[in-house]
């Protein structure tokens, strides 16, 4: 049986943390920022963890990463 391949789009967008959680960037921060408030843009900074309901999809897209 051939090796399972990682989805190339997923490996560019997600990082697996040592504890097994997956880190992702925030959406809605690329363009059309003039109508967004400063508070909203500030809260969209940084990265967050992928929700546990989506971890099954992450395990399929990133095989062999200890998820």
Curated annotation (Swiss-Prot):
The gene is rpmI. Keywords: Ribonucleoprotein, Ribosomal protein. The keyword Membrane does not apply. Coiled coil: none annotated. GO terms for biological process: translation. Gene3D superfamilies: 4.10.410.60. Residues 1-24 are annotated as: Disordered. GO terms for molecular function: structural constituent of ribosome. One of its GO terms (cellular component) is cytosolic large ribosomal subunit. Residues 1-16 have a biased composition (Basic residues). This is Large ribosomal subunit protein bL35. Belongs to the bacterial ribosomal protein bL35 family. SUPFAM superfamilies: L35p-like (SSF143034). Signal peptide: none annotated. InterPro entries: Ribosomal_bL35, Ribosomal_bL35-like, Ribosomal_bL35_CS, Ribosomal_bL35_sf.
């Amino acid at each position: 049986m051939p090796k399972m391949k990682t989805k190339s789009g997923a490996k560019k967008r997600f990082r697996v943390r040592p504890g097994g959680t997956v880190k992702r960037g925030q959406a809605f921060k690329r363009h059309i920022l003039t109508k967004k408030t400063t508070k909203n843009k500030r809260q969209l900074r940084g990265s967050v963890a992928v929700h546990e309901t989506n971890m099954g999809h992450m395990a399929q897209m990133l095989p062999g990463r200890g998820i």
